[in-house]
Amino acid sequence: MTTRSRVHGFSLYRSGLVFLLCLPYFFLEGGCTKQDPYVPPDLFYYFASYKVGKNPTTVTPIDVNQDGVTDLVTTNMSSNTLSTLIGNGDGTFRDQVQLHVCQEPRSLATGMYNQDLYPDIVLACSGGDEIAVLFGRADGKFIEGPQYPVHRTPIAIASDDLNGDHIADLVVALRNDKLKIFLGLGNGEFRHGAQYEYGDTPTSVALSDLNADGKMDLVVTNGGPMSNAVSIWIGNGDGTFRQPTDYRSGKRPLGVSFGDFNNDRIRDLLVINGERDSFSTFLGNGNGTFQAGRDSGADAGPNYGLVRDFNGDHRADVAIVNIQSSDLSILFGKGDGTFEYPPRNYRTKPGPFSVALYRVMTKEMEEPGLVTVDNGNGTISIFLHRGLKPSASSKPAASS
């Protein structure tokens, strides 16, 4: 018998076996049916868009006036501005207030840097090769604080207490393969800390305690062609870090977020890969190390993602914005670091660059809202959970 006939023979044998296995169910259950294809739940709906500055890159939920309601701030690179939108608490926001800031503000960090009652902001100013501090006020506006030069093109910034003095510090990623530490003084000023040269084109930074020792650790995505990795820097608790450990990611990793994908109460990583339309999950071991990454498919041009249980099944899901296909993808987790496919996609305005989660509160419940920053449209767009139905009178006119 030839190889081809053996293959066909196996196929016929397998078909007969399936028929024999199915035969009892045919008489008892009325026949054998194919498993229905997976259909992702439709949990969100587009609600409204709001104008911000030109080419916005980040949106950050923050209660700027401390009234218990989430507000939003965006960095707008091409207009050199910061937009503040005061929240009404029902998923809607007032019109933006713009503040002219530094050259090409690309990303921001928030904290109580001068230890008053109102949150402050530090901007990574790519066009000015500096970071700029803004102090919050009771009316929700910001005033300029000190600026600190950095060597070249700050790309990303993160903030937490790095040296155990209960004062917020900063980590800044620079385009020339450097990481710069700034240690807070508690009065809104900073002093220069350690500087590290490592990796290839850092694209994002994030801080968390990854080994449960009470000290902040650092995660950096390196998007250059010589790296394509996520680097784990274990903190020493004094504002310095040990030599990093690299984990291979997909091509051109752009952003990293934390979550718990397998419900073991250990921090895992979500890494968005800008090329080849994928994202990677890394399951944590609890000691600052991670298992090898698992790649999953995304839509065209994923740019940023976040982690949250959106459907209440106690399994972490992810929301990803895709800048080329101009949509928001929700992928529902299986509880092991993998995800159901296909995702639920929602059309966005052109060029969604980032996404953030914010609280929407009603008298009956609290639900997650999602906000995308639309780089190609100069807007932010609100997507509300279907458990929330604000009245038609509260819905603002959508911006084009």
Question: At which residue positions do the language-model features occur?
Answer:
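N-terminal secretory signal peptides that target proteins for export/translocation
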Residues: 1-12
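Bacterial N-terminal signal peptides
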Residues: 15-29
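Blade-edge motifs of beta-propeller repeat domains
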Residues: 32-54, 86-103, 135-152, 183-200, ...
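Beta-propeller blade termini
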Residues: 57-66, 86, 106-115, 135, ...
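Glycine-aliphatic tripeptides that mark coil-to-beta-strand junctions in extracellular
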Residues: 68-70, 117-119, 166-168, 214-216, ...
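Hydrophobic beta-strand segments that make up the repeating blades of beta-propeller
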Residues: 72-75, 121-124, 170-173, 218-222, ...
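Short glycine/acidic-enriched loop and turn motifs that connect beta-strands
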Residues: 78-80, 127-129, 176-178, 224-227, ...
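Blade-level signature of beta-propeller repeat domains, shared across WD40, Kelch, NHL, RCC1
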Residues: 353-399
